[in-house]
Amino acid sequence: KITVLYGGQSSEREVSLESGKDIYHSLKALGYEVQLIDYPKNFFIEQFSQEDFIFIALHGADGESGELQKILQQKRVLFSGSDHKACMNTWNKNTCKNLLKKNNIPTPKWINVSSLIAMQRNLEDDFFDLLRPFKELFLKPAEDGSSIDVFKISNNKDLELAIESCINSSRAFIFEENVDFKELTVPILNGRCLPAVEIRTSESFYNFNAKYVNKDTQLLEFILPNDKKNELEEICLKTMDVMGCRGWLRVDLLQDKNNNFYVLEVNTVPGMTSHSLFPKSAESIGLSYNDLVNEIINTK
């Protein structure tokens, strides 16, 4: 029996609900015995055994921080995607970027701050001096997804507006260098890279509106010469190995004007709505949504 866990309590709940429903209907169409459980209110670990399989469709901390995976591993219940250690490596952007840097995988320069509002209060006018070498930055929560509370920062006024707009400015954030870029993502399925997808949007970057609101965002197959394609895939597979990921994941990157690649982050539970990046990439090589779901639950 397969259980799809969806929902959760994070800011990505609505996305998770859509992903979970699409996965559930796909599994039903494939002939599996399947149930949907809204996590955590209807989830009790005691109801599962080693004969069960959990498809984790939870985005944000509920499904990607590693806590749920740890519980399932202790109970020896099989589940989709990476184990708890890999999730812990990828969930915190500072931890992830430190691992990338340690293993010589290119990633934009960054500064980690434990509390955004406290940092602003302590630094006052000195703040921009600290970040001056970066020219322009992205402000991102150290732990969150779907581009929630992500802002482009060019000056102190931008920072003040970002702090005012944040859902929670007392948590940890990173300031990340803005690379002159193309934005792209590479899904990985069972140890092989699916076609890279380039993201084009009229927004200043691929923010929440670009992902879920605006209709003009384009997801295009990212065409590269063979040598650059091989380089990109090597970077992504090395990233997967360094983080300890397995099964399915998505590596988000930038390409600068000199055609260099930079890894931004790793998603251990990628979006699985019918219009998400992962299914779009799979579709471009003839892998239907149902085929993709079937392969995810059969990856090792």
Placement of each model-derived feature along the sequence:
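Glycine-rich phosphate/pyrophosphate-binding beta-alpha loops
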Residues: 147, 202, 267-281
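Short Gly/Pro-enriched turn/cap motifs at secondary-structure boundaries
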Residues: 58-61, 141-142, 177, 240-244
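Cysteine/selenocysteine-centered motifs that mediate thiol-based redox chemistry or coordinate metal-sulfur cofactors
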Residues: 292-300
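ATP-binding N-terminal substructure of ATP-dependent carboxylate-amine bond-forming enzymes
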Residues: 1-91, 95, 114-126
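Active-site nucleotide/adenylate-binding loops and adjacent lid/helix of ATP-dependent enzymes
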Residues: 2-5, 34, 49, 89-176, ...
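Phosphate-binding site of ATP-dependent enzymes
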Residues: 151-234, 255-262
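Conserved metal-phosphate-binding beta-hairpin within the catalytic cores
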Residues: 177, 186-188, 241-272, 282
